[in-house]
A protein has these predicted regions:
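Conserved glycine(s) in the ABC-transporter nucleotide-binding domain "signature"
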Residues: 1-103
Length: 103
């Protein structure tokens, strides 16, 4: 096996580990988006997300809004990074001409 193949297999294994870590973190983060409703000059915040075919709205206390917003932003970043890692894995598979054996 050549040095280049060894390096590509190591990178593939690293990418697999990174994807698993990102997927675990994604499972702990909230899905959806924050919506604001103004009723009688008061603002109410809701976390909107899908639960099967239904759209659910859960009330958020004003203190929770920024924390949840940061978690949702982190989720978007992780989804983009996960897609990039999956693209990288496909490129490595094409370069090697096979799927590397990862333990």
């Amino acid at each position: 096996m050549s040095i280049l193949e060894d390096v590509l297999e190591e990178e593939y294994a690293r990418s697999i580990r990174l994807c698993r870590h990102m997927e675990r973190e994604l499972n702990s983060l909230p899905k959806g988006s924050i919506r604001t409703r103004k009723i009688n000059s008061h603002k109410y915040y809701y976390l909107n997300y899908r639960d099967g075919d239904k759209v659910r709205s859960d009330y958020l206390h004003a203190d929770e809004v920024e924390v949840i917003r940061a978690k949702i932003n982190r989720r978007h970043e992780l989804v983009a990074a996960l897609k990039e890692q999956q693209r990288s894995q496909k490129q490595i598979e094409k370069a090697l001409g096979r799927v590397p054996n990862v333990e």
